[in-house]
Amino acid sequence: MGKRILVQRRGRGGSQFRSPSWKRDGPVRYPPLNVTVGRGYVVEILHEPGLNAPVARIRLENGVEFLNFAAEGLYVGQEIEVGDLAAPKTGNIVILGRVPEGTMVFNVEKRAGDGGKFARAGGTYAVVVGQKPEENKTIIRLPSGKVVEVDSRGRATVGIVAGGGRIEKPFLKAGKKYHRAKAKAWKYPTVRGKAMSPYAHPHGGGSHPKGGTPVPKTAPPGQKVGFYGSRCTGRGCVRARAQQKL
């Protein structure tokens, strides 16, 4: 008798697959728009195990505290300006419509008040390309190179997210990768379906290696592994499609 495959167990959401939320310091987002803005300072810089960049705890003059990604060069005790009158200096939280073209920013809001959506990974930044004051839009270039328009009333932090270069350091040991996966609730290591027994996976079993065949989209959960709903796979498929376009 077959068993539920791993992807079904993960979808059920057992405790071993859930992210350890009790280890998190809190959501990284800007304070609500109704909060009086002005000046603040960096209380501490934290290591957030669920993220790939250090996080700064910022306290405003009115006592409101929030978490934001730390910019490169940010230090504890540094004064931070927040709001309309903030200067475009590293670490300050500014309004996008008042930022000069060519400024590097991160944790950019797509809509005013959403807390930040773009350029949040370690070592990344977006660049302000232009302004459309008549439409209340700001044009920015994302780390991927894509150019998008966002709300000019939205907020962003000037600078580059700290933690750049983290992917340049190799893991060297499987144990290091294990601990990283555990901190982020990733499944590690990943076992190939071909290496399993037939009761554990549709690709399992057999005394010699064999590949799975494409599964129809109408197949029930548990059968959908590998390619499903595909008409053609592999390099030959790419060439065939290219010839069809000619």
Curated annotation (Swiss-Prot):
Pfam families: Ribosomal_L2, Ribosomal_L2_C. GO terms for biological process: cytoplasmic translation. The gene is rpl2. Residues 197-226 are annotated as: Disordered. One of the primary rRNA binding proteins. Required for association of the 30S and 50S subunits to form the 70S ribosome, for tRNA binding and peptide bond formation. It has been suggested to have peptidyltransferase activity; this is somewhat controversial. Makes several contacts with the 16S rRNA in the 70S ribosome. InterPro entries: NA-bd_OB-fold, Rib_uL2_dom2, Ribosomal_uL2, Ribosomal_uL2_arc_euk, Ribosomal_uL2_C, Ribosomal_uL2_dom3, Ribosomal_uL2_RNA-bd_dom, Translation_prot_SH3-like_sf. Part of the 50S ribosomal subunit. Forms a bridge to the 30S subunit in the 70S ribosome. This is Large ribosomal subunit protein uL2. SMART domains: Ribosomal_L2, Ribosomal_L2_C.
